[in-house]
Amino acid sequence: VSMGRAFKVQTEAVRWSHDEAAFDAWREGRTGFPIVDAGMRQLLAEGWMHNRLRMITAMFLSKDLLIDWRWGERHFMRHLIDGDLASNNGGWQWSASTGTDAQPYFRVFNPTTQGKRFDPEGAFIRRFVPELEALDARRIHEPAAHGLFAPEEYPRPMVDHAAARD
């Protein structure tokens, strides 16, 4: 384990995006994907998030936005009250498919499906994304699909997950 270095050396050749505006949207919980936004806002508010959320948000940054996983690794270490080099680095490399026991590069969590599976009623999302608190369980995971918000109220999804996955 080495902070900022991929275990799989061949993955150092990946051309990561260095889109600071997209990184800021992810970091601040303004991606348009409610479960991602709730997790990132929890991190900023409490300095912690459940491991499932760490995987969802890390995979979203590295595989949906194609932003260098090291940016996320550093951000987590700055904010996690339980931040640990080995655990954090291993989690990021697992999510970005650059580590020893990494997910295959084609394994990408669907943030909408993950939200529906692990927060089916949307209680966690409502807690950290108050803009969505009035939505029922059917709509809270995909507010843009229901045409419920103007972008200044809650952002539209910043990427098309299906297209980003390909």
Locations of the language-model features?
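C-terminal catalytic domain of photolyase/cryptochrome flavoproteins
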Residues: V1-D166
